[in-house]
């Protein structure tokens, strides 16, 4: 049988012997080249050997798709600086204390887990489910490490249901650095109560809290009041896309009512000319084809109510698309509100009440035009992760999964 000689990739170890066991696994008996270890009580170097601890069997990176195990007896050292003869087992730079896989194998497994599941990787890498789960828990924290951040210029807050139809919500708080395209999750909180969100925001270190310029969220009061209580009114932005959703809903309901009326009053030939008006009303006017513009003119002729309401919606969209200061933007919104109130359109009455309530926070959008588009993209990733893992019901597990999927390649590649 041909032999292959390759060096062990851990310089602090010396191979004493090697063999292949009955399962076809490669067993390497090794010993450490270290001559001291930090005392677990005082932290000073302990250099006096005092026997050995129990033998450890640690799994290492595979060779030619064959599992490799390192067998080592950890040396115990006696600390000369401690009066009560404290002994400490040697610690290793290639192994986390209490772990059963080397750091190298741990990093490899984390790469395999990106956009995958523990069950899948457990089968592919022939490693126990519980052992892999413990490896994840040792490699990835269940909460944010603030030392990894120097700035939190833009935050996004949104909720997502872990169990559809059960109102089992979690709050996901994410950040998007100015010069980085990658979104990172800084918290997954159980529920969506104001007190829980506010409590987390208060845990943000003061030096990072000062760097927060914008916090994008929807109009849910639990998020709005939590942000304003801890960070103030100036940073909160009620996202423009949630605003757009609210004023397009009444327009859509009016369209349904008007189309139902027109179906009963127009002939089949005339009504057929209005086919596809739902998408015509939702498109930007500059994106309409000539045929769609003709359909829109015809719809306006048959339904003056829809024409007026559609013009109001287009005008508000135009205001939100305008690059201007907060003062100028709010002035435009106030004029729009007055114009709608004076008109015959009543479909926006409910939206106007909501807009008046959150107008200041909508106006903050004009400062630097931040929005929570990155949050909506993150929501899609979370939905995929939930389906891939057949449900994730613990906030700690969801945080770890998102950490791997979002930052795994950057950290472990």
Tell me what each language-model feature is.
Residues 1-84, 88-92:
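Short, conserved DNA-binding cores of transcription-related domains
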Residues 97-107, 187-191, 341-343, 349:
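Acidic, glycine-enriched active-site microenvironments
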Residues 133-214, 221-226, 233:
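RNase H-like nuclease fold core
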Residues 218-221, 227-268, 376:
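Conserved beta-strand -> loop -> alpha-helix junction used to position metal-binding or nucleic-acid-contacting
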């Amino acid at each position: 049988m041909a032999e292959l000689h390759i060096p062990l990739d851990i310089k602090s170890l010396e191979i004493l012997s090697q063999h292949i066991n009955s399962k076809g696994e490669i067993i390497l008996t090794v010993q450490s080249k270290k001559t001291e270890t930090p005392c677990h009580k005082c932290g000073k170097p302990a250099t006096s050997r005092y026997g050995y601890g129990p033998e450890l069997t640690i799994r290492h990176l595979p060779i030619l798709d064959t599992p490799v195990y390192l067998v080592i007896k950890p040396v115990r050292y006696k600390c000369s600086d401690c009066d009560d003869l404290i002994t400490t087992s040697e610690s290793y730079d290639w192994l986390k204390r209490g772990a059963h896989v080397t750091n190298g194998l741990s990093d490899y497994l984390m790469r395999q887990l990106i956009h995958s599941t523990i069950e899948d990787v457990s089968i592919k890498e022939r490693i126990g489910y519980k052992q892999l789960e413990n490896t994840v828990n040792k490699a990835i924290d269940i909460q944010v490490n603030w030392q990894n951040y120097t700035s939190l210029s833009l935050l996004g807050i949104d909720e997502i249901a872990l169990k559809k139809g059960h109102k089992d919500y979690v709050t996901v708080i994410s950040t998007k650095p100015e010069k980085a395209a990658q979104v990172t999750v800084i918290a997954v909180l159980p529920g969506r109560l104001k007190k829980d969100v506010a409590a987390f925001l208060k845990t943000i270190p003061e030096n990072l809290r000062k760097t927060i310029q914008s916090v994008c969220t929807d109009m849910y009061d639990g998020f709005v009041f939590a942000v304003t209580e801890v960070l103030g009114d100036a940073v909160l932005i009620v996202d423009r896309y949630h605003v757009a959703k609210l004023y397009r809903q009444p327009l859509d309901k009016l369209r349904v009512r008007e189309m139902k009326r027109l179906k009963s009053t127009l002939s089949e030939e005339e009504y057929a000319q209005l086919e596809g008006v739902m998408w015509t009303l939702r498109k930007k006017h500059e994106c309409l084809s000539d045929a769609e513009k003709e359909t829109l003119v015809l719809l306006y002729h048959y339904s003056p109510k829809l024409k007026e309401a559609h013009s109001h919606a287009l005008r508000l969209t135009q205001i939100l698309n305008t690059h201007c200061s907060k003062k100028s933007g709010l002035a435009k919104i106030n004029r729009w509100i007055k114009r709608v109130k004076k008109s015959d359109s009543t479909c926006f009455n409910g939206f106007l009440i909501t807009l008046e309530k959150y107008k200041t926070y909508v106006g903050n959008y004009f400062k630097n035009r931040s929005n929570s588009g990155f949050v909506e993209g993150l929501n899609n990733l979370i939905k995929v992760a939930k389906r891939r893992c057949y449900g994730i019901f613990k906030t700690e597990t969801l945080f770890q999964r998102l950490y791997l999927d979002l930052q795994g390649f950057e950290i472990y590649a």
